[in-house]
Design a protein with these regions (language model features):
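Transmembrane signal-anchor helices characteristic of membrane glycosylation enzymes that use polyprenol
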Residues: 9-39, 51-52, 242-260, 273, ...
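Membrane-interface transmembrane helices that cradle and orient dolichyl/undecaprenyl
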Residues: 125-128, 167-185, 196, 215-222
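Transmembrane-lumen/periplasm boundary regions of multi-pass, lipid-linked membrane glycan transferases
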Residues: 65, 195, 214-314
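Transmembrane-helix motifs of polytopic, lipid-linked glycan transferases
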Residues: 99, 103, 107-128, 166-170
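Short acidic/glycine- and proline-prone juxtamembrane loop motifs at membrane-interface regions
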Residues: 36-37, 146-160, 199-202
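Short helix- or helix-capping micro-motifs
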Residues: 17-21, 137-142, 149, 169, ...
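Interfacial juxtamembrane loops and adjacent helix segments
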Residues: 53-110, 276-314
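Transmembrane-helix signature of polytopic, membrane-embedded enzymes
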Residues: 79-92, 120-143, 178-184
């Protein structure tokens, strides 16, 4: 038995962790059979993606897109009329169609969070080089009741956590590999950060990972104050990381804007006449429609943020 553990321990431990995580997070995740927390908002938004209805909201669209994919794949409500979801941004329990199930909408958050524990395990294992230490710390994530309840709902955090931990794990893996840090490493990190930001804008805090990666990459030049070498490296690493990030972020918005081919109940979200005209003409995937739609979406996000009360602890 000890020989098996020594030979396959590097694989058995994370596999065991994943199995436990899937059981904890995935068992009966369709319960409760009613909406709670922000599910009332996100379910309505996800359904609009399925039906091609234009909408805007304060968060980028990737999370709702994945919820729409989950609902489509599971198909638990394929025989239910869900048109009421397109007529509101907040679906009350009374307005929800009778017999509606939430397993499809909850699928991405539940299982992406369940799988993200592998990234967390990998981060701690890479740092400590002790698989049992990594397993012990990972257990804190798996058995955190608040995290489990939050992730088993139609919420954005479980989805975003997958990309956040994925980005951190990738950075840790690169800097602990002992190999030279190359431009593709910055690019892949940029993709992962872009995905996290495309779920919620607060993912922009992960831009600090670029600074950390560059610091490790150029540590010798930093110690020796080789300013010219540092600037030359910055000139190539910044585009290498930021360009993929922007392509991911704006690419997701391009799909989001293109999918919005219909306005329901005159819910225009203060869209400009130019944007509405592209929708009427069925040209939402055109580059010009994207430019106008992106500007309108960003304005909506900014105006919504301006209306949020500022934290005052005094």
């Amino acid at each position: 038995m000890q020989d098996i553990l020594k030979k396959y321990g590097d694989y058995l431990v994370p596999v065991g962790i994943l199995i436990i995580s899937l059981i904890i997070y995935g068992t009966l995740y369709g319960n409760p059979k009613a909406m709670f927390w922000d599910e009332n908002y996100h379910i309505a938004s996800a359904q609009k993606h399925i039906d091609g209805v234009m909408y805007m909201e304060p968060h980028p669209p990737l999370g709702k897109m994945l919820m729409a994919v989950g609902e489509t794949v599971v198909g638990a409500n394929k025989n239910i009329d869900k048109r009421a979801l397109n007529e509101t941004d907040y679906l009350t329990g009374d307005a929800a169609p009778a017999g509606m199930r939430y397993t499809g909408f909850r699928l991405p958050s539940t299982f992406l969070m369940a799988f993200s524990v592998l990234f967390f395990y990998g981060i701690v294992h890479r740092i400590t080089r002790r698989k049992w230490v990594a397993a012990a710390f990972t257990a804190l994530v798996i058995f955190d009741n608040a995290m489990v309840i939050h992730s088993r709902s139609v919420m954005l955090e479980g989805i975003q956590m997958f990309f956040i931990l994925g980005a951190i794990y990738y950075m840790v893996r690169v800097i602990t590999s002992g190999k030279r840090i190359r431009l593709p490493h910055y690019a892949i990190l940029g993709v992962l950060i872009g995905l996290a930001i495309a779920v919620k804008l607060n993912g922009a805090i992960l831009l600090l990972l670029f600074v950390m990666l560059w610091g490790v990459d150029q540590w010798q030049n930093i110690k020796q104050l080789k300013w010219l070498a540092l600037l030359k490296r910055l000139a190539v690493t910044v585009p290498a990381g930021v360009v993929p990030l922007l392509l991911v972020f704006f690419g997701i918005f391009y799909i989001h804007i293109g999918m919005g081919t219909e306005v329901v109940n005159n819910r225009t979200y203060k869209a400009s006449p130019e944007y509405l005209n592209y929708i009427r003409k069925g040209e939402t995937f055109s580059p010009s429609a994207f430019m106008v739609g992106m500007k309108d979406n960003w304005r909506y996000i900014s105006e919504y943020a301006d209306g949020v009360p500022r934290l005052d602890v005094c």
